């Protein structure tokens, strides 16, 4: 298939985005919210938080009627937790080490599945009757509330092997019983691909043959970079895509973006197709318009509104407390860290955000938004009914994870530059900064990403900080072990093998 054919399909998809802001149901137009159902995602570090923020804002752009929940690991920095809480209704920390015995045991037996076991934690959100999980590297192009009409376990076929489903988007029903069965399956059988997709496919092994209604249409999990062999079908149905999935090692945040020309600069030698460049342009448009302003509002201390979302530490295998619980209730089933009591932090709504370090590195401060862009067009989070922010765990210092960046850059022009789509409704920020975050003098050091914003370029890069042996030992003694990165099982095994040789 030629690049021209892909080009036309991507253009059709962009046309869909232009017209996708209108209400799609009576409940949406009436502003109704289903409080016992939620969209769920996972962010394991500050880099993936960028994807989660874009995903959350893309969902809010299309007037979702369900709650938004993000699971995070202890590696996520204090500042990113604050910003996530401005978009998501619940920010829930998942700490496998401090979890219930059956979770801890599964992790000890299968340390290589640490990230997979973290994702499986979504089944413990039993204060919701049904959820839709979306990976942090997905982008929603239109309202997808109809996914909640599907049953467990509904997912789209994987483009590489259609008899298997892709676990980037799936419908599930939270259940502690199912969660235990999944962990038992992980301990006994592992994962044939070393990740959650292999484990879930072997657990729900009858998905391909049992119930066709649990096969989501491909438009709910369209890979942005797959070379589809049936080009007429892509041209015919590509414009109906509702969720784009950025599969592969190169994620949207690994590129650089020129806000003036709308071009994407690739950090590598490989060249992306025209249709992928168009989807990358969409991702960066949401990031520029709806995520960067959140950093700026935190930096300026402008996030003053009614108390908002829940910052919850869920680490014992039970369901996290309902975010709508009354004031004064501790976080249900939470385990406070040693020496720090689980407390309901007062917000101090009249306190300005003094002393908050800058979260971004401004290369050129003369331009923060493209010419003609109004601040009213930015989407923040809607007001919620939650009476207070509940924090049941101190915001911990993350551990750095080295990133691999090459110097070669290739400029990718978008297939069709799109005027940024502004929502018909503008939401004002409603999340107050937690008092701990405002008093933390090391927020800038804790942030594990460098955001460079200038007239001609926006980039996201992971900080690389080498720790001394003393600092590494102190981290281990404090229980802050980077199981997803430097301290991953595979890397420890490599060191042991070298030592024994």
Curated annotation (Swiss-Prot):
Which GO cellular component terms, listed alphabetically, does the Swiss-Prot or TrEMBL entry include?
A: cytoplasm; cytosol; nucleus
Enzyme Commission number = 2.4.1.186
Give the main location.
Answer: cytoplasm
EC supergroup of this enzyme: transferase
Cell location: Cytoplasm; Nucleus
Q: Which cysteines are joined by disulfide bonds?
A: none
What PTM annotation applies here? Self-glycosylated by the transfer of glucose residues from UDP-glucose to itself, forming an alpha-1,4-glycan of around 10 residues attached to Tyr-228.
Q: What does this protein do?
A: Glycogenin participates in the glycogen biosynthetic process along with glycogen synthase and glycogen branching enzyme. It catalyzes the formation of a short alpha (1,4)-glucosyl chain covalently attached via a glucose 1-O-tyrosyl linkage to internal tyrosine residues and these chains act as primers for the elongation reaction catalyzed by glycogen synthase.
Protein name as annotated: Glycogenin-2
Name the gene behind this protein: GYG2
């Amino acid at each position: 298939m030629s690049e021209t054919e892909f080009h036309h399909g991507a253009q059709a998809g962009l046309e869909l985005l232009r017209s996708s802001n209108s209400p799609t149901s009576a409940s949406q137009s009436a502003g109704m919210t289903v409080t016992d159902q939620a969209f769920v995602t996972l962010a394991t570090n500050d880099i993936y938080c960028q994807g989660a923020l874009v995903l959350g804002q893309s969902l809010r752009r299309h007037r979702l009627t369900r709650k938004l929940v993000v699971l995070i690991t202890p590696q996520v920095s204090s500042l990113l937790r604050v910003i996530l809480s401005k978009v998501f209704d619940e920010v829930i920390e998942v700490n496998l080490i401090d979890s219930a015995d059956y979770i801890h045991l599964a992790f000890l037996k299968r340390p290589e599945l640490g990230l997979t076991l973290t994702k499986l934690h979504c089944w413990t959100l039993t204060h919701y009757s049904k959820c839709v999980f979306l990976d942090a590297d997905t982008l929603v192009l239109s309202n997808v509330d109809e996914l909640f009409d599907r049953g467990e376990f509904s997912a789209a076929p994987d483009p590489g092997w259609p008899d298997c489903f892709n676990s980037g988007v799936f419908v599930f029903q939270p259940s502690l019983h199912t969660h235990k069965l999944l962990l038992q399956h992980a301990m006994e059988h592992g994962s044939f691909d070393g990740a959650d997709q292999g484990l879930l496919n072997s657990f729900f092994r009858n998905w391909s043959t049992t119930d066709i209604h649990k096969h989501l249409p491909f438009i709910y999990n369209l890979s942005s970079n797959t070379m589809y062999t049936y080009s007429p079908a892509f041209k015919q149905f590509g414009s109906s895509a509702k969720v784009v999935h950025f599969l592969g090692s190169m994620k949207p945040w690994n590129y650089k973006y020129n806000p003036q020309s709308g071009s994407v600069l690739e950090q590598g030698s490989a060249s992306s197709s025209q249709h992928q460049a168009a989807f990358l342009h969409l991702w960066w448009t949401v990031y520029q318009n709806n995520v960067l302003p959140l950093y700026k509002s935190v930096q300026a201390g402008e996030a003053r509104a009614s108390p908002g979302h829940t910052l919850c530490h869920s680490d014992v295998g039970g369901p996290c407390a309902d975010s709508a619980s009354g004031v004064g209730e501790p976080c249900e089933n939470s385990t406070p860290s040693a020496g720090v009591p689980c407390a309901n932090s007062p917000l101090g709504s009249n306190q300005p955000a003094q002393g908050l370090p800058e979260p971004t590195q401004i290369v050129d401060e003369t331009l923060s938004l493209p010419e003609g862009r109004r601040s009213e067009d930015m989407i923040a989070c809607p007001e919620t009914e939650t009476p207070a922010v509940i924090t049941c765990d101190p915001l911990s210092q993350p551990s750095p994870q080295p990133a691999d960046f090459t110097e070669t850059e290739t400029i990718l022009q978008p297939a069709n530059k799109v005027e940024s789509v502004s929502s018909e409704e503008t939401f004002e920020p409603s999340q107050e900064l937690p008092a701990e975050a405002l008093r933390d003098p090391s927020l800038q050091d804790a942030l594990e990403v460098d955001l460079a914003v200038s007239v001609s370029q926006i980039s996201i890069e992971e900080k690389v900080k080498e720790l001394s042996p003393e600092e590494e030992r102190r981290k281990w003694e404090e229980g802050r072990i980077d199981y997803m990165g430097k301290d991953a099982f595979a890397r420890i095994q490599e060191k042991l093998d070298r030592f024994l040789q």
